[in-house]
Amino acid sequence: MQTNIYLVTDNRTPKRKDCSYGYLMEAVDMGNRIGTAKNWRGCEEDRYGALLRALVEASGRMKPNHAGTSTVLIVTDCQPLASGVLSLKRWEQDGWIRSKGRPVKRKEEWKRVADALRGYQIAAQVKGVDFYEDLLRKGEYDGER
């Protein structure tokens, strides 16, 4: 089984401002969508922070995976966030210190993500997600694409 998590925000800048963020989740088993979840809400945050909030909320909905056979695919248009997702295990092993010896920024949020996704095989993909943002903003997502 695979869970796809699409992370979106309407904040296109690195500046903190009033914005909205959200996620779409879909559970897929053997090519069939078997469940969906979504959320869209406001905050005051920069782009990265808004997307990280979406990731924290979405990953918090995941059930524990003790078998280690399920995959989670995080889809975002933010390369730094995708890199963070792929660095989770290393950061945790290194005491939440990045490769150049600096502490991981927003460590508490990343710890929550790591705890929620423990046991899953994690992948990240950088691609446009505007389609999902539009659906969330309009409240039209019903699990169909």
Spans of features found by a protein language model:
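RNase H-like nuclease fold core
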Residues: 1-49, 60-61
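RNase H catalytic domain
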Residues: 59-138
